[in-house]
């Protein structure tokens, strides 16, 4: 491949929605096909980075944990310098890097990624928060490149209707795509990967 900028994929969503589970699943599925690295954001610890290292998502030097302090959404939006610096470090450390996943700290529905930091944005919400979440809107729901509605297996337990979520997601997002997933079993993962590869114009190769 010619030397070019890595595709930066932002992964956002509320606390507990499945962002780190998605990051782990993507790393495991794509690490033999692409040259990849990860930046995670946590408020005061590198907990998500440690989780990914512990679960052998990638080699430890391919994962940088950024401690944002204060409001995690500031570090991905208003002042993304700490994340941009981590991305630069990874690009220098691994020439020919093809994908960098940037996982935000737990944030609210109003948080979005700065265009400086992310080429593609995935926003993860989960069914256990109730079927009203899509209609609450916010930039993550309405403007992300792909909305991932995770933990669909919990719908019967929390009395959430996937039909309602489907209808509201279509209404709030217009033409923008969304996917139902259960990352615990891998349901929806192939579609998420296909989206990243297609939108990111990626060409897989054997590792």
From Swiss-Prot:
GTP binds at residues 13-20. It holds the Pfam family cobW. One of its GO terms (biological process) is urea catabolic process. It is found in: Cytoplasm. Disulfide bonds: none annotated. Keywords: Chaperone, Cytoplasm, GTP-binding, Nickel insertion, Nucleotide-binding. GO terms for molecular function: GTP binding; GTPase activity; nickel cation binding. The keyword Nucleotide-binding applies. Facilitates the functional incorporation of the urease nickel metallocenter. This process requires GTP hydrolysis, probably effectuated by UreG. This is Urease accessory protein UreG. The lineage of its organism: Bacteria, Pseudomonadati, Pseudomonadota, Betaproteobacteria, Rhodocyclales.
């Amino acid at each position: 491949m010619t030397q070019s900028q890595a595709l930066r994929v932002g992964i956002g969503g509320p606390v507990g929605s499945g962002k780190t589970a998605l990051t782990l699943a993507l790393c495991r599925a794509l690490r033999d096909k692409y040259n990849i690295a990860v930046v995670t954001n946590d408020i005061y610890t590198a907990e998500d980075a440690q989780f990914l290292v512990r679960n052998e998502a990638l080699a430890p030097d391919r994962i940088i944990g950024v401690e944002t302090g204060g409001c995690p959404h500031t570090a991905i939006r208003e002042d993304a310098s700490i994340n941009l610096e981590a991305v630069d470090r990874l690009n220098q450390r691994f020439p020919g890097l093809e994908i960098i996943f940037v996982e935000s700290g737990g944030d609210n529905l109003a948080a979005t990624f700065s265009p400086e930091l992310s080429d593609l944005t995935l926003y993860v919400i989960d069914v256990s928060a109730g079927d009203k979440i899509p209609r609450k809107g916010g930039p993550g729901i309405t403007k992300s490149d792909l909305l991932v509605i995770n933990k669909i297996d919990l719908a019967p337990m929390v009395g959430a209707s996937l039909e309602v979520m489907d209808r509201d997601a279509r209404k709030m997002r217009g033409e923008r795509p969304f996917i139902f997933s259960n990352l615990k079993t891998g349901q929806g993962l192939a579609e998420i990967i296909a989206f990243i590869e297609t939108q990111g114009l990626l060409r897989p190769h054997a590792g």
